[in-house]
């Protein structure tokens, strides 16, 4: 089974969760394409990645799309979370921008949404998780990746 992401943090998490399966990265499957995330939902992007990678590999694929939706920012960055400051920004730069935008805002409610899609050429299985919380006012901790620090 292939995990359709080049994100090493996500790959580690998927391997930990599905430890009984042999999960290959895109690189290990010799797939060197980046599927454009141009859909208007997390589910749409995950489904697109799963089906596109399946067409290349002809073996089962797990794909995800995830992001944060901040209430005070009208749900932004939402489905564009990884790209809302441009393609070449780091997680630290994105986190700093979020802290800057929320600097004087009391309502710091956020939902981290993750959609997983499994596709084997016939069957589509979908899962969604939503973690609710608040954006901190400063960086905290050093473990994890992505938005874990805020």
Which residues are covered by each model-predicted region?
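Anionic-ligand binding patches
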Residues: 1-2, 8-150
